[in-house]
Amino acid sequence: MDLINDFRDKNLILALSKLIQKESVKPLNIMEICGGHTHSIMKFALPSLVGEHINFVHGPGCPVCVMPKSRIDEACKLASMDNVIFCTLADMLRVPGSKTSLQKLRGEGHDIRALYTPLDALNLAQQNPDKKVIFFAIGFKTTTPMSANLVEKVVQEGIKNLYFHINHVTVPAPVRAIMSDENVRIDAFLGPSHVSVITGSKIYKELASEFKRPIAISGFEPLDIMASVLNLVRQQNAGTYEVYNEYARAVKEEGNVKAKELIAKYFEPCDFVWRGLGEIAQSGMKLKDEFAYLDARVQFDCSVESAGESKACICGQILRGLAKPTDCKVFGKVCNPQNPIGSCMVSSEGACAAYFKYARVG
């Protein structure tokens, strides 16, 4: 198939729409846990094609959005130190901390760089041997192998001035946290795309069985998502809760074994505080103790006193599937992409950014 045109074929999408609306006979709340899915759902107006029984619920699928304010404050403290080049992905620069943001600090003269790839941090360290280069690494298992690859190069080449602030997180743990909340009503899940390429589909089987909820691993294109929704509808009707791999063209049961081995070589699980979800055991990654000499949280003073979230912002509720962006009183008004109050409006994968771009009201 043509990966663009065929997966956006209007006639095929409308045919799936008819099947979904015909076979869907009771409410089905589907949570996607991938920011790319959120944007595709809104961009292609899929809620209007699935009928009245299907409700898309947006979960913690954006790594920038789930970053707690305390970690942003740590980043700002490190970036403010003398003789430091601080680098991270561009979306992180605009996320507000308790008192400031990386973008504001850069405007004040601090050397803060937005990287295109983690390997750019290695080049910076080699080109600036008199500087301490700190790489603030974020992302799910999709980007963790790239950070592990960078660590490996630093170790092999004996680079002495590059440090890591690791903020990588994993998928299964937050799903368990969400499902343990008695206020959450989720009937099925759209499994992440790129994350699953690394992890494989096998890791979701335990979740599906534990919570008796079907999971469909879906690609990003509208045809992918519609086919996945149809499968979830049919599983609901049949009373089954299996893992359906719609994205089989990219996702295998065991995932990318070499990438997982590289991650395991340098990282180990740790507890991590998620925005909106609180601390979740073994949901994050950190450098192994033998590589603590590269860990910015070990080598520098990262202690901070973080303020609570803005009372006007409901990002936490959105990430738990308890609210939608349009439920927020400041959405599209005080809070917008030029002046984000919360992280869900900052990131290109955030639910609020998707609603603002594709379905803004008023």
Where are these regions (language model features)?
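A conserved active-site cap/scaffold subdomain adjacent to cofactor or substrate pockets
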Residues: H165, N183-R249
